[in-house]
């Protein structure tokens, strides 16, 4: 299995970083897009990935840097001449909200009929705390607090990836606040962690900040690659015990996951 970062930046990133979306390539060659932000058509092109090569999409939460490109992807594949519906994996309530709050306005009326999400995607609503199998890879959803308070909470669903007969080898946090206890527990199961990391001078409180992640035990930090950061960071992750900042376009290979 391979994981390639189409981008490594935040909501406000430009072409030098792109949004923090990824492509997972299974041993079979099938590709799954992990989140689909507003700039995905450009980041895919830069990585020489044709949208028609994508087999599935996983959505972690509804911010535009994670779903803003889905309307484009839905129309691109629907009218692409191959009559192809991508598999769509996301938590069940999130899947309903994705259609009614994010996509319906642009995708319902296309001059043929009143369209539904299932006209564009082969939908797989997932139970909270559940998981799914894709191309022989087992994925487990991990509920992460992202924007909390004020009577309106937003969670993002991270992914643990592995195989049925082996320990989980990979964790992708997606967008999350700092959760030290949870990350320490996950580090006992995962050989490698890709973690949301804010590096701005002003802490937003909705993303784990570098200075918070710095307090994790060395045995956890040495498993962590940092992404979703701001440009021109003053921090030196290698010196601080992390594996580093993921670079735009960087690819990781996992030989123990098919």
Task: State the predicted function of each range.
Residues 2, 30, 85-87, 191, ...:
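Residues at the starts of beta-strands that form the adenosine-phosphate
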Residues 4, 58, 89, 124, ...:
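Hydrophobic/aromatic beta-strand patches that form the interior of the parallel beta-sheet core
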Residues 39-89, 189-192:
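Active-site metal-binding motif and surrounding structural segment of the metallo-beta-lactamase
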Residues 42-43, 66-69, 97-98, 181, ...:
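Phosphate- and divalent-cation-binding pockets in alpha/beta enzyme and binding domains
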Residues 169, 176-258:
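Cap/insert and terminal regions of metallo-dependent hydrolase folds
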